[in-house]
């Protein structure tokens, strides 16, 4: 996969459950944070978009858990994106930094709501050309 963005992160204690591994819900936070940081790297603020009446929202998400992360683990969240009709599809994978093992493979489908209405968006056109 030709990733277009990477974000290193580290697991915090409170993200782990009783089994000592990252709770599954926190992976969705990691993916969302990566998308927001990707936007910022492209010069776009998620909050700024909302103020302009543009709200990218998740329509569907699929996460396949491969190798658990534990407290203190460093990892890299990687992203690839493509446009399919009015959707932007983000292929997001998380890798443990210490050994490169795949921890999660995710596919996140997003759409844009513009002034309260589902709409096609040119939001990532410049980024899409890079892929």
At which residue positions do the language-model features occur?
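Short alpha-helix capping/helix-loop boundary micro-motifs
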Residues: 60-64
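Hot-dog-fold acyl-thioester-processing enzymes
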Residues: 1-58, 113-130
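HotDog/MaoC-like acyl-thioester-processing domains
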Residues: 3, 65, 70-71, 80-130
